[in-house]
Regions:
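Flavin-dependent oxidoreductases
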Residues: 1-86
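Dinucleotide-binding/catalytic capping subdomain of oxidoreductase cores
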Residues: 63, 67-122
Length: 169
């Protein structure tokens, strides 16, 4: 979760890791629920840990596209004020700036690409590539965002692709 690293640190584990939050935005398709009846994923880019924009059918039958993987500025950055912490903001910005300047794992390109997804037309164009019969005007409403808790190895300046298991004897 969003505070797993802090919890681990409190118990003396995972000191070389910190969490970098990424915001996932979604757009709801409001035109016709039958236009897409299953989850549809793009071929993943193995150079980054994110799936890319994909179609999801929700439990109530709605269709949404997303998520983005936009670097968030604090752990609970669901909107511009929710859960704001100046200390957290400083920590997150420090590591995001470090990743951006060092361009570790092409973070700069990834961040700039993801920021483009704030543009609704661009965001929808990515989904259109997978389902050409979809009406782009049907994507009307932004839904509640999610925050991905992404672990960062502070020593290697790399994202951790899997779990880290540490413990005492």
């Amino acid at each position: 979760g969003l505070y797993a690293d802090k919890l681990a640190h409190d118990y003396g584990f995972g000191k070389r890791y910190t969490l970098i939050p990424f915001k996932g935005l979604y757009l709801k398709y409001t035109k016709n629920k039958t236009d897409v009846k299953m989850n549809i994923y793009p071929v993943p880019n193995l150079k980054n840990p994110f799936l890319g924009v994909h179609y999801t059918e929700t439990v109530d039958g709605d269709i949404k596209i997303g998520p983005t993987a936009i670097p968030a500025f604090w752990r609970e950055n669901y909107d511009m004020s929710h859960g704001f912490s100046l200390t957290e903001f400083g920590e997150v910005i420090f590591y995001e700036a470090k990743l951006f300047l060092a361009n570790s794992f092409n973070f700069r390109g990834l961040a700039l690409e993801e920021m483009q997804k704030y543009n609704k037309d661009y965001f929808v164009s990515l989904a259109e590539k997978m389902v050409v019969s979809i009406d782009p005007k049907g994507f009307t409403d932004w839904t509640k965002p999610g925050i991905r808790a992404q672990l960062l190895d502070k020593e290697k300046l790399s994202l951790v692709q899997d779990f880290v298991i540490e413990g005492d004897q």
